[in-house]
Amino acid sequence: VVPQGGNTGLVGGSVPLQGEVVLSLRRLEALSAVDQAAGQVTVGAGVTLARLQDHAGAAGLAFGVDLGARDSATVGGMIATNAGGLHFLRFGGMRDQVQGLEAVLADGTIIRHLDGLWKDNTGYDWGRLLCGSEGTLAVITAARLRLVPAYAERAVALLAFMHVTDAIDAVWELRRAVDSLAAAELFLGSGLELVCERLDLPKPFPETHQAYLLVECAGKADPTDELAAAVAQLGRLVDAAVADPGRRQLLWAYRERHPEAINLVGPPHKLDVTLPAARIAEFVEQVPSIVSEVAPGARCWLFGHVADGNIHVNITGPAPDDEASDEAVLAYVASLGGSISAEHGIGTAKKAWLHLNRSPAEVALFRAIKSALDPEGVLNPHVLLPDAP
């Protein structure tokens, strides 16, 4: 049985491979009234992120996770992959939003813990175990989620730098100086040029620079002055644009529409990695040459949630079944002490490289947990765990 939500995953986690039954959860669309006292809501697994955001907003609250695929991504899939997204810096990922779950085990047993108590020290936190389990342990059918304050006042700025290192240094300076910082996104001059050219967007600055940061602040009071003051203190900043409310969406488009523009070049190999803070700049600067060594002529497109170390690596040029560039990048990530999967999960696409991050003892533990909850191997049998030797 392969559980399936909005089909926005990028590692094949909800794709049947050998005649499995697809279990669509899209019709589990129940939404409870928002519990204003607790700041929580109970939702069905098939509710889209956009619908959840609208529901929370109507109650004067917000949901802490946001994704570019908000119109299609569903709550169940986001929990199953422990999605991160644009505001991880401020609110964390899906595991941090889950107060309780309802799920169905492989034998049909329904387990439910949706009371939403903030403190409940009564045994194993099985709900958090299911976050990131990719449908291998149980089928998530509903969730109790925490909501966050709706920060109506926002400030967005696009910052340009001559060097990647300067942009990375600026992130840490802004994190220290700006309490209201909600997002910090990195992309490169090559990516910005591609987005503007392929999607007919105006260039934000007269000249193209090597690296850009898109930063957003959010608060009850207007954070524009706080952000502007911090930006004024940044070293090696070569240009900046602080958006008025009418231009915020355009500045975000330069970052959010990267995948759309890259797809117009050709089918990309998509990698989603995390680096230690001290190695991010080195990775961004070196990975194109790492790719070129094994795939001459390939193009590397880099962007991501830099404040939490998450870089998306898109590679165009190699054939879909040519994994030499994937192998080279993921091995390089591991050599720097990073993770081969930041937020997309392992699925079928990355399980061959799980050993780069997880020891044999850890993989054995994973198998033991899987065997305990799904002894017949019914649930999503071909994802996450490497094929048995």
Functional labels for PLM-detected ranges:
Residues 1-389:
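Noncatalytic alpha-helical scaffold of FAD-dependent oxidoreductases
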